[in-house]
Each structure stands twice: as C-alpha cells, then as structure tokens.
C-alpha cells in the first residue's frame, strides 16, 4: 500500500491537483481573515475599478471588492460540492449495496428507479427542482444529490456483484455472520476504492452544477457563491470583465483539482489499468 501512495505522490499532476485543492480549502476556511474588505461593502465611487495595488482583482459594478467576495464565495461553493457529493455517495452506497447483495426483486426495483433518474436530463431536472422549491443552498444541495446518486449506486452494485461470491465472504457467512455484517464489514470496505474515486469527481461536478444554476439566476441570493458572482457580473462583463474572470478561474481550479486527484486515486486503486495502457 505504501508503494501505491508513493506512486500517487510521485505523480506531479496529482500532487498539483492536491496542492490546488488544499489552497482553495485553506482560503475558504480563513477567508474572513485574508479578505482586505467587507465583501458586502458598497462604494459607488469605486464602481468597476480595474485591478490595481489596492483592489487586487478590481471591484464589481457596485464597488465591492472582487477578491474579498471570491474568497467568501469559495467557502459556499466548496461546501455545496462536498456536502452534495457526500449525500449522493451515502444514498448511492445504500441503494447499490442492497441491490447488489440481495439481488432478485429488490435489485430489479432499485435499478428501475435508478434508470428513471438517469433517463431524465439531469441539469434540466435540477433547474425544475430548484425553481419549484426555491433558490436556497439547501435546495441546491438536495437537487444535486438527487441527480448524482445513481452513479454511485450502479458502481456499488457492480462491486457487490463481483465481491459477494469471494471465499472470504463465504467463510464469514458460514461462520454465522449476519447480512448486515456481510454488507458493511466484509464487502463494503473492499468495494470502497472505486467509490472514493467517483465521489471525488462528484465534488467538482456538484460545484459546476451549482455554478450553472446560479448563472441562470437560480442561486441563493442571500449567499455569495462563485456561481452567484458570475451571474451578477454577466450584464457588466464588457466593461468589468475582471468581476467574472476571477470567480470563473476559481471554479475552473476547483473542478480541475478534484479531477486530477480523482485520476491519481484511480491509479493508486487500479494500478493494473495504468500498466495495460
């Protein structure tokens, strides 16, 4: 196992993604400490000020410091991505493990439900859900989780179908292990590798979905997120392009970092795939 992680850290692309994500996480945690201005401080006299020594990435159309707002917004966007991916992963693991372990009619019903969610265009469904129930951070998280759990469910099911016939599972069953123990103590820990990789990629996907919803005007107006910043800067992009460029770059870096880390973890968990290539 140590050799596998050594391979991860020797892959400069994965390490680069990890460094970016750590920097973004630290920025989100200590945002109020490093923000030079109040993110909601309005100053008409400094409207649409270009980047300079005082305002590092300029101000927006209302005179608010873009850097201070982006630092605060990064926290919200990361939280949405992490929580939505976490909820999606938990639901997917539960559905996939039950489906793969028990099979039969339960597997048939759960997989048909999964297919229903996968048939409907996901972003369109997210727009409908948020429009119906309100543009709040909680509703956005729930909408994203509802759209992405089938990915984890199908992956978990395939892992369970592959692992439940292994000898160590049969030995535990003959030893009197209950179904709960077989699922959560014997099979699931050995199936977690690919699930962790997919969950990592879901964080970036959730952040992109939140940004897309916010860009369409469905973001939480009471919270500053990177997507909300893009939406608010859209009418003024011709003469205050920096107000859209910086939050857009933050979204790009966050999604890029999660994808690079996911690829690195995949190489650690499935080294033979890399060797075959």
Which stretches of residues belong to each language-model region?
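Amphipathic alpha-helical segments that mediate coupling or scaffolding at interfaces
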Residues: 7-8, 70-73, 77, 98, ...
């Amino acid at each position: 196992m140590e050799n596998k992680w050594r391979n991860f850290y020797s892959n400069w692309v994965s390490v680069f993604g990890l460094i970016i994500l750590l920097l973004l996480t630290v920025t989100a945690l200590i945002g109020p400490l490093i923000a030079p201005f109040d993110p909601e401080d309005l100053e008409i006299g400094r409207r649409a000020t270009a980047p300079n020594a005082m305002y590092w990435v300029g101000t927006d159309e209302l005179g608010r410091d873009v850097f201070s707002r982006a630092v605060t917004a990064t926290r919200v966007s990361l939280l949405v991505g992490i929580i939505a991916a976490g909820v999606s992963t938990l639901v997917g693991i539960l559905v996939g493990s039950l489906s793969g372990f028990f099979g039969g009619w339960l597997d048939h019903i759960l997989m048909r439900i999964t297919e229903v969610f996968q048939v409907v265009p996901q972003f369109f469904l997210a727009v409908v859900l948020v429009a119906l129930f309100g543009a709040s951070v909680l509703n956005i998280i729930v909408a994203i989780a509802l759209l992405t759990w089938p990915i984890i469910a199908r992956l978990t099911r395939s892992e369970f179908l592959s692992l439940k016939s292994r000898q160590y599972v049969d030995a535990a069953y003959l030893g009197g292990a209950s179904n709960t123990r077989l699922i959560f103590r014997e099979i699931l820990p050995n199936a977690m590798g690919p699930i962790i990789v997919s969950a990592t990629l879901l964080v970036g996907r959730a952040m992109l979905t939140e940004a897309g919803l916010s860009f369409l005007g469905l973001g939480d107006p009471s919270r500053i997120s990177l997507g909300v910043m893009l939406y608010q800067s859209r009418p003024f992009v011709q003469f205050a392009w920096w107000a859209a460029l910086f939050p857009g770059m933050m979204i790009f870096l966050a999604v890029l970092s999660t994808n690079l880390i996911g690829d690195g973890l995949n190489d650690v968990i499935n080294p033979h795939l890399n060797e075959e290539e």
